Amino acid sequence: MTDQSHQCVIIGIAGASASGKSLIASTLYRELREQVGDEHIGVIPEDCYYKDQSHLSMEERVKTNYDHPSAMDHSLLLEHLQALKRGSAIDLPVYSYVEHTRMKETVKVEPKKVIILEGILLLTDARLRDELNFSIFVDTPLDICLMRRIKRDVNERGRSMDSVMAQYQKTVRPMFLQFIEPSKQYADIIVPRGGKNRIAIDILKAKISQFFE
């Protein structure tokens, strides 16, 4: 955990795929933005930092284990977090779930008072943990995560149910048990039941609001 005197406060939200991380992050962002303004709070998804695979064929790209820490460019993410803390803007990568690689365009992100960082593998990397002012683990039962993942990937990402189930059995569940669930020990706060846990969201809002005082 970092010293809170840093210009940019980084809050990490981790948990299984489809556990409700993005919902919690977006809810906190939306409700806190109404209080403090868009210029003071932002959200960065860890998914933006999947490694560039433009040099690989599509056949090779789809074989990537996206739930293993090696799929992430955590070195670039670390560099960007440190830049934001220094007060410098970053060029946020844009990742395509359809093309399975990083796009050419980037999005400029200016430093904010608070950045909410959310992703499945955040707490598996000690370097990233050291940059977080505090961290949250969203603890949702795997059967619920699977149902949400099927709905999301089929409806929003154009995948077949068979491919989603195959990936879940081959990599998603094993990687959760090997890497993600053990990283829960590093979280400062554990949130059960995902993004619809209103009491937990209100507690988190109160905690984050302290950084704006």
Swiss-Prot record:
Q: Which reaction does it catalyse?
A: uridine + ATP = UMP + ADP + H(+); cytidine + ATP = CMP + ADP + H(+)
- A Pfam family it matches: PRK
User: EC class of this enzyme?
Assistant: transferase
The entry's ATP-binding residues are 15-22
State the EC number(s). 2.7.1.48
Cell compartment(s), UniProt: Cytoplasm
**Does Ribosomal protein count among this protein's keywords?**
no
Give me the Gene Ontology terms describing cellular component.
cytoplasm
In alphabetical order, the GO MF annotations are:
ATP binding; cytidine kinase activity; uridine kinase activity
Keywords, A to Z, come to:
ATP-binding, Cytoplasm, Kinase, Nucleotide-binding, Transferase
Asked if Transferase is a keyword of the record, the answer is yes
Q: Which GO terms describe its biological process?
A: CTP salvage; UMP salvage
Pathway in which the depicted protein is active:
Pyrimidine metabolism; CTP biosynthesis via salvage pathway; CTP from cytidine: step 1/3; Pyrimidine metabolism; UMP biosynthesis via salvage pathway; UMP from uridine: step 1/1
> Would you say which domain of life the source belongs to?
Bacteria
InterPro entries hit by this protein: P-loop_NTPase (IPR027417), PRK/URK (IPR006083), Uridine_kinase (IPR026008), Uridine_kinase-like (IPR000764)
Q: Which family does it belong to?
A: Belongs to the uridine kinase family.
Q: What is this protein called?
A: Uridine kinase
- Organism, as annotated: Escherichia fergusonii (strain ATCC 35469 / DSM 13698 / CCUG 18766 / IAM 14443 / JCM 21226 / LMG 7866 / NBRC 102419 / NCTC 12128 / CDC 0568-73)
